[in-house]
Amino acid sequence: MGTLLRAHNKLGLLHPLHGFAEKRNLLCSSEGQHHFRFGSKRSHRTWWRNPCVRARSSAVLELVPETKKENLEVELPMYDPSKGLVVDLAVVGGGPAGLAVAQQVSAAGLSVCSIDPSPKLIWPNNYGVWVDEFEAMDLLDCLDTTWSGAVVFLDEKTRKYLDRPYGRVNRKLLKWKMMQKCISNGVKFHQAKVIKVIHEESKSLLICNDGVTVQANIVLDATGFSRCLVQYDKPYNPGYQVAYGILAEVEEHPFDVDKMVFMDWRDSHLTNKEELREKNCKIPTFLYAMPFSSKRIFLEETSLVARPGVPMEEIQERMVARLRHLGIKVKSIEEDERCVIPMGGPLPVLPQRVVGIGGTAGMVHPSTGYMVARTLAAAPVVANSIVQYLGSERRLSGDEMSAEVWKDLWPIERRRQREFFCFGMDVLLKLDLQGTRRFFDAFFNLEPHYWHGFLSSRLFLPELIYFGLSLFSQASNTSRIEIMAKGTVPLVNMIGNLIKDRD
């Protein structure tokens, strides 16, 4: 599947590896050393039920992030509603996926309007990618830091070295490049929020919160996890990946600056914290770290997947204990981020009039939370499909065009792949800390082709079956018993869904 990525290298696309992020003010300590303090706890149930609501947390660190929201210095050609023109494509959402589709559709000579409440705002989160994925897109210049490989700490004694270079995206440069291509292709921008869409036979009316109505032949929802335009008709009960991260200046840290820390499952930092240790044994969290120097590092405590998600305050509390145990003293915080990523769950109604991409189209990797390789493949597929059907000699209705685009976005092989990934998520949901360690011990013992392909969504059902059998053969006897005991019901469900889902 490496060729699939390379086939679209001209697009210049990355979809963010994040769900909802929110910046919070952090209180300053009166002491010389900066430690962490937590306030009262609040329920997170409301924003897990409604992904349109951002994560809230009263738990705070003692430092104020220094970086403020930043906008690109670029002049945008704005949409003129007074002309009453019907554009070929309206893209709702100015994230990487939306801009990528806008870029390629406009390159084919079609008219595009990008609608976003903050079109110049630089994306807030730190994006990490495997270097080979960006190399396939000719986007290596958009990586501001690379590491020769990665390391996984399973416990105090066991670690895995991953011989696969990793990089951090320069999100400002990436957005600038994508915006420049959109502008040169004639994309128009409208700074507003879409609150309603009314569909007619051959066009749709997008009603914005500023009173403007944008008319378009096709509507693309690229708003992430909001689920505000794309419709679902099945109960929505995903797993949740929850993470809290900081980009910080520290006095020192113990990590090799030549390798990023992909996962650190060690729990010795909770030895004297019985309640946290018990919770971590049942639903574990790991540290993800990108060291830029001996004193500057991105640190993120992550719950891989849980249902319901681990409360943000608890994620922060575990992170505090870990950093203290590692002797990491934070001097200042450049940025902080809170992420909640819905994983798995049903696909949206297929087909439907509004086309989706990214999180709103169910494209998050259900086992890992990754979307990069998946969206790399999907953005040009969506764009090419839109160009093809809008330019068709046979006059298609709005419903017919959208149905064809959805069919290209979610062909049977992609739906089957997603079913397998959901099966993997269901197994991970049932594993405790020890089971998770055993699972990843076997996972990273696989041939690189298979764990690379699994993480980057490059394996399809025949290879995924071999992947599963290989993983089972690599696992310890204890892990095999555990997989059989906890994976039988999810396996039966997966097989049933595969049988029912036919073209």
Kindly label every feature range from the protein language model.
Residues P284, R338-I357, P411-E419, L428-L433:
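FAD-binding beta-loop-beta segment adjacent to the flavin cofactor pocket
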Residues P380-D503:
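Long, low-complexity C-terminal extensions of enzymes
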Residues Q104, A108, K181-S332, P342-L350, ...:
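Predominantly flavin-linked oxidoreductase catalytic cores and closely associated redox partners
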Residues A100-E156:
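N-terminal FAD cofactor-binding segment of flavoenzymes
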Residues G362-A383:
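A conserved FAD-binding loop/helix module that cradles the flavin
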Residues P65-S114:
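N-terminal Rossmann-like FAD-binding beta1-loop-alpha1 element of flavoenzymes
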Residues M1-T46, C52:
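N-terminal chloroplast transit peptides
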Residues R307-E337, A377-E404:
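Flavin-binding catalytic cores
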